[in-house]
Regions:
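N-terminal low-complexity segments that are often proline-rich with Ser/Thr-Pro
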Residues: 270-281
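DNA replication initiation modules
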Residues: 99-128, 156-271
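N-terminal processing/targeting junctions
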Residues: 30-31, 244, 280-281
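Intrinsically disordered, low-complexity regulatory segments in eukaryotic proteins
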Residues: 2-11, 192-199
Length: 282
């Protein structure tokens, strides 16, 4: 799978959009859009509908989207990504998108670890050390709020969500074994959150980075291990490495041990879900 290379801040918008779509590749037939309700103060993400607010077609506000017979998911296009990066849609309204990482065959092309509490700086630092020790490339993003972080793992092939989740669980387990005192209390979840898609569902979503307004205050951007924003976000993304076999194997102790999963859903610290094998490839 090729990667758009040699992109930097000075590259064309078309090149940036192409790179962004390659790295954050999930379901292409649907995306989520961030909403804010000024009256209730509520905010979140929901699947975008191609028929939203179309007169005579859209049932809002009297019919909920999930109950509307005219609901039609809007697909991801270059224009959707451009709107995300500039922070406004074609009508000038605020625009932030999220993607559904799990494809219909229950594989993913990226994964992430989400940290979202007061101890996130310490916890992220420890997990990053584990990742570096195991030789895995990772991209560290400060969250939209500035009060958390995502560790992104870009894959160079479609990999079963179950396999990816098991590998990331292993990274967390190794970190806890080496630093039991930290507890990883800020750890929130692995993305994708599920091993398999719920029947008729889309799975979880994740908000994408490089959101325009948060970016202006140093949030929703990629940072170095000291949490300092990188000067050229596009050059970093263009030169970022992908993993596939490495994530499957998660080598430890100089490559002598490899993660094997029982196929059961796992969670951090649930060590009964793993055993180790000294040789061979998965």
């Amino acid at each position: 799978m090729g990667r758009t290379e040699n992109i930097d801040n000075g590259s064309s918008n078309e090149e940036k959009v192409a790179l962004f779509r390659e790295l954050f590749f999930g379901r292409q037939d649907v995306y989520a859009r961030r909403f804010e309700n000024a009256k209730s103060g509520r905010s979140g993400y929901s699947p975008e509908c191609a028929n939203k607010w179309k007169r005579g077609v859209c049932g809002l506000p009297h019919v909920k989207c999930g109950q509307c017979g005219n609901r039609q998911f809007a697909p991801i296009t270059d224009e959707v990504v451009r709107a995300h990066l500039r922070g406004r849609d074609m009508d000038g309204k605020p625009f932030v998108m999220g993607v559904y990482p799990m494809q219909e065959n229950e594989s993913v092309r990226f994964a992430a670890l989400d940290f979202d509490e007061s101890s996130w700086r310490r916890d992220v630092s420890m997990v990053v050390k584990t990742v570096r020790k195991l030789g895995l490339p990772v991209a560290l993003e400060r969250s939209r709020s500035g009060k958390g972080a995502h560790l992104w793992f870009f894959l160079d092939a479609d990999i079963a969500a179950r396999t990816v989740r098991a590998a990331l669980t292993y990274l967390l387990t190794v970190t806890l074994e080496e630093h039991p005192e930290i507890g990883l209390s800020s750890y929130d979840r692995i993305i994708p959150c599920q091993d398999t898609l719920p029947k008729g569902g889309l799975g979880n979503l994740i908000a994408l980075p490089l959101q325009r307004e948060p970016r202006q205050v140093g949030n929703s951007v990629f940072v170095n291990d000291d949490l300092v924003p990188l000067a050229d976000q596009w050059a970093f993304l263009s030169s970022s490495s992908s993993v596939s076999r490495e994530l499957r194997e998660c080598n430890a102790e100089n490559g002598k041990q490899k993660l094997i999963t029982t196929g059961e859903r796992s969670s951090p610290g649930n060590r009964g879900r793993f055993f180790f094998h000294g040789g061979g490839r998965m």
